[in-house]
Every structure is written in structure tokens, then in C-alpha cells.
């Protein structure tokens, strides 16, 4: 009831009382977990209700008291993880709803509490990543919906939390890529959908974080290419989907981000040309797709950006660049769409 009515002081008092050494041995772990996970008549736990109702004071009180409570009563990481993984009656994770609905303030409270919980309760990397990948009953991740719906604040909170989490658990570059490219039931990634729908706030948030991700998690060129292309499960790039949907700002942002960060990522002239000549499963490049669909402005943008990068990176004499440049210019002289090669 205290949680239900938002009485943070009472909640804190109860949790702190359960943490007193006098309670140790009086309550079994099973009974303690029963108290912590007490549900209302609809099957919602107190933590689920507090988070769902955006009661930041109650949630903060619970999370602040949890490390001592777990230590006093010798709760193991699986029990703490189970408590944090509060679900509704349809087994949808509470953090799924937080991310899907764009409640960045609540997500930040939970993620800020994780480093201490990792240290004191020994949460594993797999458990922490599972919280970040919180899903609904059908297996759709909340982060995916946040990206699809343009909730850039959710993306920003997660990206900003990753370095501090990495200090506690061994999060690798591949773990981060896997998290950021998590897929829906339709096997599309959130970034793919953000590009398709033109959610510039999400895309800019992602690309602005790339230097930090690169330096913190030692990303390699392969990791970076995955994020720039944002492929779905059919290896169809989000960049190409953006072209199909005339999202010129998205296309420009992707190529500018590549231009801005290529040196940091150690991209060579060949790497840059690989990206420019990357083909969808249907065997056409981004430029060819734009031209075939009659999006001449986007096609010209792609050519102009390539020319600028060739000058900036000093590979204007590269045979691949010269051949591609000539091919693009020849196509653009044609009055009607050209069948892609």
C-alpha cells in the first residue's frame, strides 16, 4: 500500500528495517522475496507500479535500499535480478514500457543505480544486458520501440550509462553493437526504423556518441560499419531504406558522420570505397538506388560527399574512386532512371 500510494518515506523505512541485522535469520529468503515482490490484485509488483506511475521518489528509495537489504539477507544476484525484472500480468518487462513510452527520467534513475548493484549484488553482464534489452511478452525490445518512435532521450540515457557500467562488468564492443542493433519480431533494428522514418534526433544521438563508444569499448571498423549501415535481418541497410523513403536528411547525416569520424576509426581509402560501393542483396548501391528511384537530389548528394572525402583523405587518384566517380557522373547525365547494374 505504501508503494501504491507513493509514500516514499514509509517505503524507505520498511526496506531499511528489513536490512537491520536483527532481521537476519528471522525471514527466509523465500519469505523476504515474497515481501519484496508483493503484488496487487492485478498481479503488479510494487516496483512495477512505482515505475509505471513515474513515482521517482519511491523508485529511488527502493533502489537505494536494495544493496544493503541484499547484503544483510544474503540475496544472490539471481534474486536481485528477478526483483529488478518486474513484469506485468502478460510478462512484459517494466523497463520495456519505460523505454517504449520514452520515460527517460525513470530509465536514468534505474540505470544510475546499476553500478552499485553490480558491485554489491554481483549482477552478471548477461543480467545487466538483459535489463537493457527489456522486452514485452512477444519478445520486442523496448529500445527498438524507442528508436522507432523517435525517443532519442532513451537512446541518450543508455549510451551515457554504458561507460560507467563497463567499469563494473566486461562489456565488449560486440555487446554494444548487439544491444544497439537489437531487432523486432519483424527482424528490423531500431536504427533501421529510425532511418526509414527520418528520426533525426535518434540518428544524431547515435552518431554523436560514436567517438566515445569507439574509445571506451575499442570498436573496430567492422563494428562501425554495422552501425552506419543498420542492416535488418535480410542484410538490407537502413541507409537504403532511408533513400527509398526520400529521407534526404538521414542520408546526408550518415555520410557526414562517416566523413567526420573516418580518421578516428582508422578507415582507409579502400574502406571508404567499400562503404560507398556497398550493395544491397538486390545488387545495387545506395547511389544506384537513389538514381533508379528518381531521387536525383540524393544521388547528387552521395556523389558530392564522395568527392569531398576523396579530396579530404587524399585518394583522388585511387582507381576505384575514379571509376566510381565517372560511373556516377555518367548516370546523372541521363534524363531518365537507369536500370541498375
Regions found by a protein language model. Give the residues of each.
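Non-Sec secretion/translocation targeting segments of pathogen effectors
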Residues: 333, 337-341
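Ankyrin repeat domain, specifically the short helix-to-loop turn at the C-terminus of the second helix
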Residues: 15-21, 26-34, 63-70, 75-82, ...
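Conserved ankyrin/ankyrin-like repeat signature
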Residues: 10, 58, 105-106, 153-154, ...
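Ankyrin repeat boundary/linker residues
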Residues: 39-40, 87-89, 135-136, 181-184, ...
